[in-house]
Amino acid sequence: MNIETARMVIRDFTINDINDMQDILGDAETMKNCEPAYTIEKTADFLQKFCIEKGGAVAAVHKETAKVIGYILFNEFGEGVYEIGWFFNRAFWGQGFAYESCKAVIDYAFDKMNAHKVFAETIDGIKSVNLMKKLGMKPERIQRSQTKDNFGNWADLYLYGILSEYRQ
């Protein structure tokens, strides 16, 4: 995948992205709704096996700095149905980079891959849900106390999706 937006380049990962990925995955605040912050070894393993070998995620590169500031999980869940997810470097939160990058990937899915649906899920009921709504996704279900957060507390899981005929 190679997509260019006004401020971002969405591309496949390389092993050279390790330090930028560690800045994201090694940050406890970024990872608080997922799992404990990654060690450099765990980041390297995740980058190699999931992002590069499996192609399970793409890099969101900030054009101005050439730095990987986010990763976007993007997987085919079923025929014509894709899951998207994201983690961005905390220094770049609140500036529209996640929206710009995810919107580009969703548009690519519908325009180039003939996707029928793209969905996302989160236990963050505020920030991520707000982004899902901004991306045009609609609520599909809330699973109460479905999973545990990074601190071992039960958390609700929010599922949002967008169908090809309802996209912006």
Predicted regions and their residues:
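Juxtamembrane/interface motifs at transmembrane-helix termini
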Residues: 40-44, 52-53, 89-91, 121
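Conserved GNAT-fold acetyl-CoA-binding loop/helix
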Residues: 29-49
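Acyl-donor (CoA/ACP) binding surface of acyl/acetyltransferases
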Residues: 1-29, 61-168
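A general structural signal for well-ordered secondary-structure junctions
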Residues: 30-31, 53-56, 115
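A short helix-loop-beta-strand connector motif used in the catalytic cores of GNAT acetyltransferases and
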Residues: 48-61, 70
